[in-house]
Swiss-Prot record:
Keyword Chaperone: yes
InterPro entries the UniProt entry points to: SDH (IPR005631), SDH_sf (IPR036714), SdhE_FAD_assembly_factor (IPR050531)
Organism, scientific name: Pectobacterium atrosepticum (strain SCRI 1043 / ATCC BAA-672) (Erwinia carotovora subsp. atroseptica)
Role: An FAD assembly protein, which accelerates covalent attachment of the cofactor into other proteins. Plays an essential role in the assembly of succinate dehydrogenase (SDH, respiratory complex II), an enzyme complex that is a component of both the tricarboxylic acid cycle and the electron transport chain, and which couples the oxidation of succinate to fumarate with the reduction of ubiquinone (coenzyme Q) to ubiquinol. Required for flavinylation (covalent attachment of FAD) of the flavoprotein subunit SdhA of SDH and other flavinylated proteins as well.
Protein's UniProt name: FAD assembly factor SdhE
Length: 88
């Protein structure tokens, strides 16, 4: 998936697990455009992860072995915390 194909990335953000949608969609909608290309690639790679892995990582029940993905999880958590709850 290309980092500038926002419609495909948006679709990939919709996971089918409400908890993941609540974590990933606001980050994509509010923060994706501010990321540099390297971070955009890491985010797209993160979206290729399995839902159970994403859920566990975002809920702090483990972490990715890949350093870039680990940093992206941390960035998502930080930005979402700083932004606060959003209406879905």
């Amino acid at each position: 998936m290309e980092i500038d194909n926002k419609s495909r990335i948006h679709w990939a953000c919709r996971r089918g697990m409400r908890e993941l949608d609540i974590a990933i969609m606001p980050f994509f909608e509010h923060d994706y455009d501010t990321l540099n290309d390297s971070d955009k690639r890491a985010f797209v790679r993160l979206l290729q992860s399995d839902d159970p892995d994403l859920f566990n990582w975002l809920m702090n029940h483990g972490e990715p072995k890949d350093g870039e993905l680990k940093r992206m999880i941390s960035l998502i958590q930080t930005r979402n915390k700083d932004r606060g709850p959003v209406a879905m």
